């Protein structure tokens, strides 16, 4: 399989890239609704919403549906490999790979200075039930990006997972 990529080109800093994504595959015979259908839908919905309101980002935002996360990270590895070959400037990557329930927290892997800036977003997000901002976060698909570009900040969404494995 291949990664599926959509992009909104930045108006002021088009060479600075923010990646948002989830992965297309799941474990057979599971249907993959939470791992990671929800992350794919969330990624597509962010792009759809931005397009619907005519949002023009300052930086380029890439919306990536990664291939083959469950069996070798081929999509994430290829994305990072191609980005490095093109000498792209990836400043932030956010992955949703933990289901589609109510958001409760975000985890971030970034410098102390970046984390202090991100903490300023907390009051904007807390009314939606997402009240925790923690150190350490990211995702399997965006991990290769951090290895290719050590200064790339990573984020991961942590939804309420108490019913993740309910039958």
What are these regions, as identified by a protein language model?
Residues 1-33, 45-55:
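Soluble metallo-hydrolase cores and metallopeptidase-like ectodomains found primarily
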Residues 81-104:
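A glycine-rich helix N-cap at a beta->alpha junction
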Residues 49-74:
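Short helix-loop-beta-strand segments that form the rim/entrance of peptidase-like active sites
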Residues 14-18, 57-62, 87-92, 126-130, ...:
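Loop/turn elements at helix/coil->beta-strand transitions in domains of secreted/extracellular proteins
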Residues 33-41, 55, 70-74, 112-116, ...:
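Soluble non-cytosolic domains of exported or imported proteins
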Residues 24-26, 64-72, 97-100, 122, ...:
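Acidic, glycine-rich active-site loops and adjacent beta-strand->loop/helix elements
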Residues 40, 44-47, 58, 73-80, ...:
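Extracytoplasmic/secreted envelope proteins and their assembly/folding machinery
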Residues 101-167:
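Active-site-adjacent substrate-binding region
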């Amino acid at each position: 399989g291949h990664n599926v990529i959509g992009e909104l080109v930045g108006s002021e800093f088009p060479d600075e890239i923010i990646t948002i994504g989830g992965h297309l595959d799941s474990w057979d015979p599971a249907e993959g609704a939470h791992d990671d259908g929800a992350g794919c839908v969330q990624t597509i919905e962010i792009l759809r919403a931005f397009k619907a309101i005519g949002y023009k980002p300052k930086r380029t935002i890439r919306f990536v549906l990664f291939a083959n996360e469950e069996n070798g990270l081929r999509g994430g590895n290829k994305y990072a490999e191609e980005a490095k070959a093109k000498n792209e400037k990836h400043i932030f990557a956010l992955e949703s790979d933990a289901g589609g329930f109510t958001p409760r927290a975000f985890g971030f892997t970034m410098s102390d200075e970046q984390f202090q800036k991100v903490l300023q977003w907390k009051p904007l997000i807390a009314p939606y039930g997402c009240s925790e901002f923690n150190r350490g976060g990211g995702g399997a698909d965006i991990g290769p990006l951090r290895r290719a570009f050590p200064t790339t900040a990573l984020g991961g969404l942590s939804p309420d997972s108490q019913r993740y494995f309910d039958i």
